[in-house]
Amino acid sequence: MLNWEMYNSKSSEFRNNKPFPHIFMKNILNQDIYDQLYNEWPNDEHFKLVKQTMKRYHHGPSRYLDEDVQNNHHFPELSDAWNNFVSYLCSDEYITNLKNITGLEITKLTEFSIVDGLKGDYIHPHVDTSAMQEDN
């Protein structure tokens, strides 16, 4: 599903980037998976409107779906393609690869959000590893 070869080649870059570890990569999803997810993007009725004041990390208003995915990897309002993607992000394969690339002690995906940034928002697709590390 993901281009792990590309990810693995960026491990050193991730670990050494300043002022914090990060990487930016294009085309990380296999094209057929991307096309299916793109074509099955949730429609307006699936989103709740988030006002700028509600989410400090959004530049502008955005719409989002989010769920606690620790115990349930299924969003009834999403397509099979999106549910398969969420399940993959919760899989041992994904977590193990992400742990190997980042060097972080990642244990599980605890939350999943689909954010549809509206005009003026600047958030791009990303993984917040802090949300995936086990609480101490």
Which residues fall in each region the model found?
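Catalytic core of non-heme Fe(II) oxygenases with the double-stranded beta-helix
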Residues: 76-136
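Conserved double-stranded beta-helix
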Residues: 1-12, 107, 130-135
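Non-heme Fe(II)/2-oxoglutarate
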Residues: 2-5, 11-97
